[in-house]
Amino acid sequence: MSLSNNNSNRVAIIGASGYGGLQLMRLLSDHPHFKVTFLGGNKTAGNKWHQIAPFIKSSEDLTVRKADPEDIAEHADFALLSLPNGLSSQLTPELIKRNIRIVDLSADYRYRSLYQWKQVYVKESTKYIRNDDSLCREATYGIPEWNEGDIRKSKLVACPGCFPTASLLPLMPFLKQGLVENEGLIIDAKSGTSGGGREPKEHLLLSECSESIAPYSVLGHRHTSEIEQQATLVSGTPIQLQFTPHLVPMVRGLLSTVYARLRDPGLTAEDCKTVLEAFYRSHSTVEILPVGIYPSTKWARYTNKALLSLQVDKRNGRLILVSVIDNLIKGQAGQAIQNLNIMAGFSHELGLPLTTFYP
């Protein structure tokens, strides 16, 4: 239970009309302690919430306002930024100056240096002028099951991407223990169309993506370097890996399959399962499935839970890790609120769904 005063748990959602913002509003509408007191937007400024999303209840029919830092600071203690890459950086420094604690859902502060971000987000770096390298160094990478202590005291948490979340959760325990080789790591991941956001895009049209599955950004996907950065930090040695995402014709859900070679070929699947269980025993947001049971994305849909499974191929000494999440919940908004819970002193799972509706 939190030591926080309920009066200091006011939350601003900036970018409320995108998929991330909609999920945040939906989840916080049932939260026992946080209260949404400010909605910020650009295109939707001036509209009442019920005009934007009549299908999501709100205790107060707030009007969406321009994201003015002074206005936000007057109405909120925390800010959840669900903005396009680059845009968060234009608002964050001013909010930090006003003692607003931030969870940023974009990639703006996931890298430990501004230079790294500019190397990956080239287009955005030419559009938005940034001089906040110190904030990049100070920001906490928000995988709650791994960085709880830093998140608790952080003023700026960078929420991981959906692909990094699903890929790193099963992989990091083995890198941390030095149980897998650093070379030859392969991640094959598949995600639904909502991962592309709410803005219209040709390749996300029903007639384009229905009844089809396709890889994209086979080389140089932006999440590759994000995964590599965290894998390197955990293992203590530089890591380069192969990451290939695929678009599948479903709305939500993400499946990641990670291939790694075991240093000790004598390890069994049960041995490896014990490794995962040891790391996540105290976390209800991660569930380890029995050996031989492999999760479906539908099992995690609408939840803030990651389902992990594994197998060992004794023929080649390879460890196969399988992870599924809801890309909009555990891969985005739910994880953001999980971080927010920690920052406010609440339990990880407070106000978050952990059981799916099936089918």
UniProtKB/Swiss-Prot annotation:
NCBIfam families according to UniProt: argC
Q: Which reactions is this enzyme annotated as catalysing?
A: N-acetyl-L-glutamate 5-semialdehyde + phosphate + NADP(+) = N-acetyl-L-glutamyl 5-phosphate + NADPH + H(+)
Enzymatic class: oxidoreductase
What name appears for this protein in its UniProt entry? N-acetyl-gamma-glutamyl-phosphate reductase
Q: Where in the cell is it found?
A: Cytoplasm
Q: Which SUPFAM superfamilies match?
A: Glyceraldehyde-3-phosphate dehydrogenase-like, C-terminal domain (SSF55347), NAD(P)-binding Rossmann-fold domains (SSF51735)
Keyword annotations of the record: Amino-acid biosynthesis, Arginine biosynthesis, Cytoplasm, NADP, Oxidoreductase
Listed EC numbers: 1.2.1.38
- GO CC list: cytoplasm
Which GO MF term does the entry hold, naming one? NADP+ binding
Q: Which InterPro entries match?
A: AGPR_AS (IPR023013), AGPR_type-1 (IPR000706), NAD(P)-bd_dom_sf (IPR036291), NAGSA_dehydrogenase (IPR050085), Semialdehyde_DH_NAD-bd (IPR000534)
Source organism superkingdom: Bacteria
| Family to which the UniProt record says this protein belongs | Belongs to the NAGSA dehydrogenase family. Type 1 subfamily.
- Does Metal-binding appear among the keywords? no
User: Annotated pathway, please?
Assistant: Amino-acid biosynthesis; L-arginine biosynthesis; N(2)-acetyl-L-ornithine from L-glutamate: step 3/4
Q: Which GO terms describe its biological process?
A: L-arginine biosynthetic process
Catalytic machinery residues = C162
Encoding gene (name): argC
One Pfam family from the record: Semialdhyde_dhC_1
State what this protein does: Catalyzes the NADPH-dependent reduction of N-acetyl-5-glutamyl phosphate to yield N-acetyl-L-glutamate 5-semialdehyde.
Query: Where is it chiefly localized?
Result: cytoplasm
